[in-house]
Amino acid sequence: PKGVPITHSSCDFSTKNIAKTLQYSKNDVDLLPLPLSHSFGLGCLHTSLYVGSTLVLQKNSNTTDILNSIKKYNATTLAAIPSTLSKITSNSHTDSLDPLSNLRLIITNSTFFPPETIRKLKSILKTGIVATYYGLTEASRSTFMIFDDEEKIESVGRPSEGVQIKIQNENNDDKIGEIWVKGQNVINNYWKKEYSENKSDEWLKTGDLGRFDDDGFLYILGRVDDLINISGEKVYPQEIERIVKVLSGIDEVVA
């Protein structure tokens, strides 16, 4: 494990970015069924404190409790991991999902958010949006994605304001390669290390594989270390998982 020193300036930068991009305000009631020991939950806490909204901390991610809390506290935003949101939308009793309909925002963070879950959430919300962001503890909230385009439903979005992202590979082209990030959201070095092998000229080497489309939207294809070479062909496990996951009768898949 590596220690990641988080600076005040990087927290301030990321917090202001998410507040501006997703229009958080003092009028929001933010439901947070996430541990504050993780950067996702802690980042949501920072955002609520920054805008002066009401924050409801929930000690578990039980789907029934989440739905009850939304109704009880008139929550306007919900932050949860993809697996929790998938469990909520898989509820066979559609009427029980009514509390979700009044949310203005559902936010998650993940390299992969199942498209079927996104579609179900969007169908339930009246006027609200579903969003995600991509980032690491070392480079928080590097991209943002608001799911309003079916063609981009598997993307993690465009680079956040003030953040640079590039694709680095052996050919020095921008097709598929390791995702490098640069910006105020990126750490200087790991704990007790003057030099980091993960940094190059202020760029953070994330270890994630990705590509940009023609519109500048980023797609995550997996991890550099997970890349499989079959008869000279590069195979990305996450691409296999995405294809198999949409087949009927498949609930979970690991490649």
PLM feature segments, named:
Residues 12-29, 37-77, 91:
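Conserved AMP-binding/adenylation subdomain of ANL enzymes
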Residues 102, 162, 249-252:
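Glycine-centered tight turns that cap/initiate beta-strands
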